[in-house]
Amino acid sequence: MQELYNPKEIEKKFQTNWDENQSFKATEDPSKEKYYCLSMFPYPSGKLHMGHVRNYTIGDVISRYQRMQGKNVMQPMGWDAFGLPAENAAIKNNTAPAGWTYENIAYMKTQLKQLGFGYDWSRELATCQPEYYRWEQWFFTKLVEKDLVYKKMATVNWDPVDQTVLANEQVIDGRGWRSGALVEQKEIPQWFIKITAYAQELLDDLDKLDEWPEQVRTMQRNWIGRSEGVEMDFKVSGKEESFSVYTTRPDTVMGVTYVAVAAQHPLALEAAKNNPTLAAFCKKCKNVKLAEAEIATMAKEGVDTGFKAIHPISGLEVPIWTANFVLMGYGSGAVMSVPAHDQRDYEFAKKYDLTIKAVIKPANTDLDISVEAYTEKGVCFDSGEFDGLDFSAAFDAVETKLVAENKGKRQVNFRLRDWGVSRQRYWGTPIPMLNLEDGSVVPVPENELPVILPEDVQMNGIVSPIKADPDWAKTTYNGQPATHETDTFDTFMESSWYYARYCSPQSDDAMLDPEKANYWLPVDQYIGGIEHAILHLLYSRFFHKLLRDFGLVDCDEPYKKLLTQGMVLADAYYYEDAKGGKVWIAPTDVETETDEKGKVISAATKDGQTVIYDGMSKMSKSKNNGVDPQVMIDKYGADSVRLFMMFAAPADQTLEWSDSALEGSLRFLKRLWKIAFDHLALGAVADLDLKSHTEAQKTLRRELHKTIAKVTDDIGRRQTFNTAIASVMELMNKLTKTATKTEQDRAILQEALLAITKLLAPITPHICAELFEVLGQTEEILNAPWPTVDESALVEDSKLIVVQVNGKLRAKLTVAADAQQETVQAIAMENENVSKFTDGKTIRKIIFVPGKLLNIVAN
C-alpha cells in the first residue's frame, strides 16, 4: 500500500475494472429479490452540472447499498434527447441538432463514468433514436384505435413576422425571441390524449403512494382538482339558445346578479360584431395568453355584451358580460357571478357598478359585505324556498329542483385538462398520423413504423425542416396520396415511459417484454427534482396506467418510492452596466472580504471591478454561478465530490456549495487512508478473541457496532445520508484516540476498518474498494455483504451512573449493567462526595433511572 492517497490513480483503476467486467450489468433472476433504482435521466445539454451530480450520487449510493443487502439491483441510464435547446444550439452553431446531441451524450457519458456511477450501460437508450420512438408512435396509434386520442383547435403563440409557432420559452416580454414582433394567440388543430378519462384513478391511487413526499402528492391532488358541484343551464333572453355554467356553490344561486363569459365565447363573438368596444376588448384578450396564477393577480376587466340571461330558478333577467378572467379552455367558458359571495365577482361588480345581492349569512353573527365578499359557507336567506338551509341541504335542494325542471344536474369536475401533445417543432418524435385527400385522418399503418425524423437537416430558426420540405410529408395510404403529420410530440411523451423501456431496451419486436417488465417494475426508488412533481410524474403515472390497460405491465403505479433532492446553491456576484443591466461574474473570478462570521463585506473581480454580492442562489447559466463538476473531479477526485454531495446537507434539502467543505471531504479520505496505512505498516493482524477483551476494548467494539446499526438505519430506512457519514466520522475520531498497543487492539481496528470501508463503499466506492483489497480481502467489495451488527457487542457488562444530590452532580459510578436501585443506592451512599452532602439530612425522595441516573433529594 502506498503511503499517500492518490484518488486519480485509484479511481481510474476501479472504473476500468468495472467497465471491463460489466460489474453493474443486471439480468432477471427470479430467485433473488429485485431492486430497481432510477434517477431521472438528463437532457444532453453539453456537460453535467452539479444538480445532475447530486441527483446521480444519491441514486448510486442507494443502488450500491441495496446490492450489498444481497438484492438484484438494476440502475440504468439514458438520455432525454429531444427538445428545443438542441434546435436553438443548432441554429447558433449552424449545425444539425442530431450531431450536437450525440456529441453531448458522448461527453456526458464520460463524465458519469468518471464519477464512478454503477450504471448498466448495456441498457442505455436515447429518446431521439428510431428504435426508441418507434414504439411511442406504435402506442399512440393504439390509443387512437381505443378512442383515447382526438384533434381539436387549440391556442398557440404565433410570431406573425417569422410565420411560426413559438414555445412559451421563446416569448420574451410578449415578443418573439428572434423577430421581436408582438406575439399573437392563434388557434390551430392539435392532438390531445384523454388523460381526463383517468383523472379519478390518478387521484385515488395517490393514496397508494405512501412512500412519496406528501408535498408532491398534495401538488398532484391540487392539479387534478376534483370538485363536486352542479351544472345548470341559463337561457339567453330573446333567443332559442342556452349555455351551461358549473358551480361548486349552488347554495348561492339566488345571489347571481350577472353572468361572465370568455372573450372567445360564441355569445361574446356574436355581440362583438355590432359593438366596436367589445370587439377591441375580445381582440385584446385573445392576444394575451394567461396562466391561472396570472389571472388571479391581474386587473379584472370586462365589457357588457348587451345580452341578458334568464335565471334558471327565479326567471329574472341578469346581464351577460365578457370578462378577461374567464377562459374558454376551462369548463364551458361561462361562469355565474355572485358578487356578494365571491371576491373576484365582488371586485368586478364594484368596478362596473353591478348589483350585489347577499344570500348567505353566518349562522351566529351579522353579515358585513361593505368592504369584501362573504365567501364562507353559512345559511341561506333572501333565497325564497331555500331560506334557512345550510350549505349541504341547499346544495341538495337546488340540485333536486334543477333536475326536476330539466335545467341542471349534479356533476363531478376536474381541473385537469386533456394532454395536448402536438408541438410545431422539428427536434421531436413525428406524430404517426396521415392526412388523406378526403379530409380524413388515419394512423400510420404498423408495418410503416417508425416514421423517421430526418437528422441531416439545415436549421434556419424560422420553420421546422420537416414542415419546410413538402417531399418529406408526401406518402401514400392504400394506394391513395396522403401526407404525414408534420407536428412532433411534446417531449414529455418520451420521458413518460422510458423507465419501462429500460427493462427490455433491446426488444425490437415489442414496446416492452412483459416478462422482463413485470420482473423489474415498479421502480423501487425514483430520484429527481421537485420541479417535476406535477407534469412529468403525472404524465408518467398516466402512461403507466395506459400500458397496464394494454396488458404490457401488471402493476398500477410506475414508482414505488420517490426522493426529491434539493437544489444546489452557490454564491452569485454581479455589477451593473451602463444601461443598468446586471452582468453576472463567476465566483471563481471574484475576491471577497468577509467579517468574523464569514459574511461578505466587499467583493471585487481580480482586475479590481467592484461587484455586488447577491447571496446564495440556484446554480444557473443565467447567474454564471455554476461550478464545473469536471474541474472538481480533476482537483479533488470523484470520491471527495461524492462525499461532499452526500454530507453537506440532507438529500431532500438545498445544498450550499463550498470549496472549503469539499477540501474537508478530501482531508477526511486522506485521514482514513493514513489510519489504514499506519495499521498495515505494523504487519499481520491476529484474529479477534472476544473473551480476552478489556473494558476499553469492549467499549470500542460497542461503538463500532452501534455505528453499523445507525448507518444501516440512516441509509436504508431514513435516507439521512449526511447523518450516516457523521456517525462514521465520530467512530474514526474514537479510533484515532485509542492506542493500538496490543494484538487485540489491532484486531479490533482491523474489524473497524473493514466495517468502515463497507459502510462508506456506496458513498466513496473507489477508495473503499482499494482499502478493502489492501486490508486482505479477496472478494470484491461490490459483492461483499453489508456489515452486520454483533448484538452481543452491544450488551454492556457495566454502566456509568450519574449520582446527583438535589440535582447537582456529586459522583459518577461504574456499576453492573443490571444493577437494581438498592445496589446503586448502597454504593452511592458509601461514596465520600455523596455522603458529604447527605449526612445529617433527611432523604425525602430518590429518583432512579436504570443505567443512567440516581438523584437524591435531601434537606
From Swiss-Prot:
Compartment annotation: Cytoplasm
GO biological process, any: leucyl-tRNA aminoacylation
Motif 'KMSKS' region boundaries: 618-622
Pfam families reported in the protein's UniProt record: Anticodon_1, tRNA-synt_1, tRNA-synt_1_2, tRNA-synt_1g
EC number(s) reported in the record: 6.1.1.4
Disulfide bonds: none
Assigned GO CC terms: cytosol
Catalyzed reaction equations: tRNA(Leu) + L-leucine + ATP = L-leucyl-tRNA(Leu) + AMP + diphosphate
Protein name listed in UniProt: Leucine--tRNA ligase
Species of the source: Psychromonas ingrahamii (strain DSM 17664 / CCUG 51855 / 37)
